[in-house]
Swiss-Prot record:
Job description of the protein: Not known; does not seem to participate in nod factor synthesis but required for nodulation on some specific Medicago species such as M.littoralis.
Descriptive protein name: Nodulation protein NoeB
InterPro entries per record: Alkaline_phosphatase_core_sf, Sulfatase_N
Keywords: Cell membrane, Membrane, Nodulation, Plasmid, Transmembrane, Transmembrane helix
Pfam family, one: Sulfatase
Membrane topology of the entry: Multi-pass membrane protein
Organism encoding this protein: Rhizobium meliloti (strain 1021)
Length: 553
């Protein structure tokens, strides 16, 4: 019996985080990618189990080998589940991480060797507990501790969500979308800043500026000075995270694989999702005659493997499994780069918002929860009832990208906004469900909740100053901003403010409405709200006034 336990325990222990990974990235384990990844892990687990079984109780050397194989199993589990190796490497370098990992393995081998008589029972109990915790719902922890933790903060970025006053009610679904969003936020006690706008048109600049409560003009082109040197999508300084830490809150980050908010100097609990199901996407393309219908099935399966690896991208072991699985599928990653769609985050949004909700309800007070969702970001893959549309067309920058002008531009804008507002109605439904679940829990009655867009819909002629008309400024920069906090009155605020300034006002308090100016081409300070606008010459930028607006007039 003990040998059977030793044979199967490594397999069960290593498969548990893989099962969790499949649940996390919304991929069917029965897909080609699923079979390839599971086969790799199963081979490793069974090989370790066979070695442990064969060597068990075959003298001191045999027991050392058994202890060694089980120690390797536990190390691989730790890396698959928590990214132990890369986390160490981030702090002490690759060589230091390798040395520490080796030392840890030696210590673990010695401990297991000393406890060899009890090892089979220990491994069996650990394997059963892991499998149970992976497959079964743990339930929700709702009992308050003796000392009440600090009120929670819930912070959601809805990528490409235009502001309330930026919604043109004359366009298809516009009036319905505006009413639905307003109704949801009013129902749940929010204050809506109807004329909020972002100072920046690009997410990688807008969101870190908001998280640093920075409403200045000190930004170098398409980059953020809060990013690591030479990086565009990894951010070192996010002062809101630091502020939440000082307030006694644990910071939890829920993000896509496109922008990384986890590498910040503040310690965070990181959840990175990659939710693209390549096989289903390719099947739809073939059925409907889409532009990617001729992509080989192996490339679609590779997309699933890539999603699994990115969803566990802190794991060295998962990266190795992904490499082997990709080779089993006989394809190359370069094939993926030619067609990888930007639609998978949008398709998985309802699922991921539900996962974010579960994490909030599970962890409770004493936590700050940050999430960045690419929704209602293009393309519009859902209708107003959150049913898939099987539509994959990008809608941004109709002149600069699609070459449209005149009547063609106007007609395309009306059409694209119809799809966009339909997806916005889906967003309103999902947010309503989310708020119903979270706010019905008494632990979150005094939570601070912020929901904002990072820029406008970008259904415009383009982003460059030379291309933009007055309405394009609204399309590109108007951004949703809603806040629910004790002491903040419910209702609608029609003052013109940037989301970056609103964050500074909300979290820092007593901030000047005059933006600090550091850019050399701008002298002094400006009392007028303004936006950071690219121009055709990539070496120069423009600071343009953001005039009062109401898109329905």
């Amino acid at each position: 019996m003990k040998r059977i336990v030793l044979l199967l325990s490594p397999l069960v222990i290593l498969l548990s985080p893989i099962i969790d990974a499949f649940q996390g990235v919304y991929i069917d384990p029965r897909s080609d990618a699923g079979y390839a990844v599971i086969a790799c892990v199963a081979i490793i687990g069974l090989a370790l189990g066979m070695i442990a079984t064969f060597c068990y109780k075959r003298g001191a050397v045999g027991n050392v080998v058994t202890a060694g194989t089980l120690a390797v199993t536990l190390f691989l589990f730790g890396d698959l589940s928590y990214g132990v190796f890369w986390r160490l490497a981030d702090h002490i370098g690759m060589e230091g991480a390798a040395a520490l990992a080796f030392a840890g393995l030696v210590v673990l081998i010695l401990i297991l060797f000393k406890l060899m008589a009890a090892v089979p029972r220990m491994m069996a109990a650990f394997a059963v507990a892991l499998l149970g915790s992976t497959v079964l719902d743990r339930g929700l922890i709702t009992e308050a501790s003796a000392e009440e933790p600090a009120p929670a903060v819930i912070y959601i970025v809805t990528d490409e969500m235009i502001g309330i006053s930026g919604i043109d009610t004359r366009l298809p679904h516009g009036a319905e979308a505006k009413a639905a969003l307003s109704r949801v936020f009013q129902k749940h006690g929010f204050r809506l800043h109807s004329k909020a706008f972002s100072r920046h048109i690009l997410t990688q600049v807008s969101v870190p500026a908001a998280l640093n409560m920075d409403y200045s003009y000190n930004f170098p082109g398409d980059r953020s000075h809060y990013a690591y040197p030479g990086e565009v999508t990894k951010f070192k300084v996010l002062s809101l995270f630091n502020l939440w830490h000082r307030q006694g809150l644990s910071v939890n980050v829920f993000q896509s694989a496109h922008l990384d908010f986890c590498k910040t100097e503040a310690l965070v609990d990181c959840h990175t999702f990659a939710s693209f199901d390549g096989s289903r996407f390719i099947q739809r393309q073939r059925t409907e005659g889409g532009p990617y219908r001729d992509v080989p099935p192996a490339s679609a399966s590779l997309a699933d493997v890539k999603a699994l690896v990115e969803g566990n991208r802190q794991s060295l072991a998962m990266a190795a499994v992904g490499f082997v699985a990709s080779n089993l599928l006989e394809t190359k990653e370069t094939a993926l780069q030619e067609w990888h769609p930007r639609s998978y985050d949008q398709l998985a949004f309802p699922y991921w918002l539900g996962q974010f909700q579960n994490m909030i309800l599970d962890k409770g007070r004493g936590n700050a929860f940050f999430a960045h969702f690419l929704f209602p970001h293009s393309p519009s893959v859902y209708n107003k009832d959150c049913k898939p549309t099987n539509r994959w067309v990008e809608r941004s920058y109709l002149t600069e990208v699609r070459g449209l002008a005149g009547q063609e531009l106007d007609e395309a804008r009306v059409k694209e906004y119809g799809f966009y507002f339909a997806q916005t109605l889906c967003l309103a439904k999902q947010l309503d469900k989310f708020f119903n679940a979270v706010l019905s829990d008494k632990r979150f009655q005094d939570a601070t909740i912020v929901v904002h867009g990072d820029h406008g819909s970008r259904i415009s002629a383009g982003r460059n100053v030379e291309t933009m008309s007055p309405r394009d400024y609204v399309d590109n920069y108007s951004a949703l901003y809603a806040v629910r906090k004790p002491g903040v009155a419910t209702g609608t605020d029609y003052k013109l403010h940037s989301v970056q300034w609103l964050n500074a006002s909300l979290f820092r308090g007593n901030v000047s409405e005059v933006a600090p100016t550091v850019v050399g081409s701008i002298q002094g300070k400006s009392d007028d709200p303004a936006v950071y606008a690219p121009i055709t010459d990539p070496d120069h930028v423009a600071i343009m006034p953001m005039h009062d607006f109401d898109a329905s007039h």
